């Protein structure tokens, strides 16, 4: 998916996202400039420690085939240790046509989504079970409040890309479908909860894989 010059300019706007996410941050404050990894030597810290290059593969579309399914590339504390204590992280989301980021939550942070290329339909549900939806174009932003179940969907026939900023170095993710149907909850419990029968539950579980515990 080739990014237009306009789309690349939108990425520059994303540098302001950390300022907002810091306001919403929930990570514990630190008493040092930054957190050195366990058993790390402060004398060995260089600019490389504060640099993350994992998004290059996302934007270097000329050398990599377009994915055929929804793909997320994270830059959280796990992938970018320098974020530890900084209360900020990013993720890139790539949506081929007719793909979805299924309903999920981030228990430790709000999410600020910037559509970089293409268009997305998004929404979240609040604690009163009210659904809020919006159709977004390139350049639009949408905030998903902390802990709310939300989704993003590319219903069009063109690919889409988005950048998400979080107010935590480890926002966490709880995918609703696989968490409910792929973690070993008794089938009878699920059948009664969804007012259906066990064979229907088994059909729902057949195509789901357990969530990643990393």
Swiss-Prot record:
GO MF term list: manganese ion binding
Pfam families, per the entry: Cupin_1
UniProt KW keywords: Apoplast, Glycoprotein, Manganese, Metal-binding, Secreted, Signal
Top-rank lineage group of the source organism: Eukaryota
Record keyword Glycoprotein present: yes
Subunit-level organization: Oligomer (believed to be a pentamer but probably hexamer).
Protein family (similarity comment): Belongs to the germin family.
Official protein name in the record: Putative germin-like protein 9-2
């Amino acid at each position: 998916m080739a990014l237009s010059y306009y789309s690349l300019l939108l990425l520059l706007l994303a540098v302001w996202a950390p300022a907002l996410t810091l306001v919403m941050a929930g990570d514990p404050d630190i008493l040092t400039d930054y957190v050195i990894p366990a058993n790390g030597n402060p004398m060995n810290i260089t600019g490389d420690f504060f640099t993350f290059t994992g998004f290059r593969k996302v934007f270097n579309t000329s050398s990599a085939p377009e994915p055929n399914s929804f793909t997320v590339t994270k830059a959280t504390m796990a992938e970018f240790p320098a974020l530890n204590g900084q209360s900020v992280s990013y993720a890139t989301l790539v949506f081929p046509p007719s793909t979805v980021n299924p309903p999920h939550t981030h228990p430790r942070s709000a999410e600020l989504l910037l559509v970089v290329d293409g268009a997305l339909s998004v929404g979240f549900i609040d604690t009163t079970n009210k659904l809020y939806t919006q159709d977004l174009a390139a350049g639009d932003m949408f905030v998903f409040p902390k802990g709310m179940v939300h989704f993003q969907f590319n219903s069009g026939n063109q690919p889409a890309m988005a950048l998400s900023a979080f107010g935590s170095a480890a926002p966490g993710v709880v995918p609703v479908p696989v968490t409910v149907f792929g973690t070993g909850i008794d089938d009878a419990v699920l059948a009664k909860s969804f007012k259906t029968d066990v064979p229907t539950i088994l059909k729902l579980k057949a195509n789901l894989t357990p969530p990643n515990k990393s």
